[in-house]
């Protein structure tokens, strides 16, 4: 967060100001609009090694109605939403199919987010209706296996993403907002 938000984005937004002379010809320096490549690239690289690859492994080892897959998908959408908001178009729908993967437009990525969240919410709602037992409580450091909290988080994420597109695709945003706030669990 510090490197990618505060020391990169916040400097450009003038939340911070350098207290030194400008170095136009010198080394990389975010204060002088010569970005440290590592700071700028690390969120993108980490998203694929620490979010997408583990998600893909879970998908390959679970079935479509697995609560584990649903939870992993919610985490993936949360992580990748920040990446597409920061970088714009990203490799998403074809991830894992090769080295040179086409980039998806932000519209396509957001639409895919909504589909994936809807599917994950359906899986977790089905699980929650069959049992009140926590799911993988021992391994869930966020909600301790409380599936209804994951459903609420997924709907909150769905609402957040819908608000992000509300000025560019009002109809889709309205549909997703209604689905998020109309869910029986929250």
Segments predicted by a language model, with ranges:
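Structured, solvent-exposed acidic/aromatic patches
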Residues: 19-75, 79-186
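A short, exposed helix-loop element centered on a Lys and neighboring polar residues
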Residues: 1-17
């Amino acid at each position: 967060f510090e490197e990618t938000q505060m020391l990169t984005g916040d400097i450009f937004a003038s939340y911070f100001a350098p207290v030194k002379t400008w170095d136009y010809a010198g080394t990389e320096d975010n204060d002088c609009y010569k970005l440290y490549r590592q700071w700028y690239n690390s969120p993108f690289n980490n998203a694929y090694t620490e979010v997408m690859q583990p998600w893909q492994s879970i998908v390959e080892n679970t079935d479509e109605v697995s609560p584990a897959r649903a939870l992993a998908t919610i985490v993936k959408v949360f992580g990748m939403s920040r990446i597409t908001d920061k970088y714009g178009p990203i490799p998403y729908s074809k991830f894992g199919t090769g080295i040179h993967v086409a980039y998806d437009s932000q519209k396509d990525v957001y639409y895919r987010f909504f589909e994936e969240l809807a599917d994950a919410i359906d899986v977790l709602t089905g699980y929650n209706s069959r049992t009140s037992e926590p799911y993988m409580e021992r391994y869930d450091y966020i909600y301790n296996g409380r599936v209804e909290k994951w459903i609420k988080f997924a709907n909150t994420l769905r609402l957040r993403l819908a608000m992000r597109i509300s000025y560019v695709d009002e109809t889709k945003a309205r549909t997703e907002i209604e689905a998020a706030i109309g869910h029986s669990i929250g």
